[in-house]
Design a protein with these regions (language model features):
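Phosphoinositide-binding peripheral membrane targeting modules
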Residues: 35-98, 105-109
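Anionic N-terminal interaction surfaces
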Residues: 1-55
């Protein structure tokens, strides 16, 4: 997670305590299905956030960034959203392979996102969810 925090810190006006690259909920399974079945259902967009999106958590705000992966590094393109942390609720549900969570803002917008937890990612996701103050099922 340190590389993710380091990539985002220069773009935020407060200390970032956690960061994670996330996908729109369902997009990872949709990607696998599209590879098996062709482009059926490709191109659907369910959010104003880019997919994938980089989410950063500070003590006062939650940030969303558009980014491009560059090998094991990240090229941050631009900030696409910022919400006061105390106005965002997060509910998470974990499975063995995936954690799905929904960010709901004070204005009522909801952003269902997902992060893989396989291959040792569970501990990093737990740190991220704790920083978000997520309630977990």
């Amino acid at each position: 997670m340190a590389k993710m925090v380091d990539a985002l810190q220069p773009h935020c006006d407060e200390e970032i305590v956690a960061a994670m690259t996330c996908n729109h909920a369902g997009s990872m399974s949709s990607f696998l299905i599209s590879k098996l079945m062709g482009s059926v259902g490709a191109g659907t967009k369910s959010s104003r956030l880019p997919n994938p999106v980089f989410i950063a958590v500070g003590s006062r705000s939650i940030y969303a960034f558009d980014y491009a992966p560059r090998g094991f590094k990240f090229k941050i393109k631009k900030e696409v959203a910022r919400w006061p942390k105390d106005e965002v609720s997060v509910v998470a549900e974990k499975t063995n392979m995936m954690t799905t969570f929904v960010l709901t803002t004070g204005s009522g917008e909801s952003y269902p996102l997902e992060v893989p937890t396989m291959m040792g990612g569970k501990e990093l996701v737990d740190v991220f969810l704790n920083a978000l103050d997520a309630s977990q099922d």
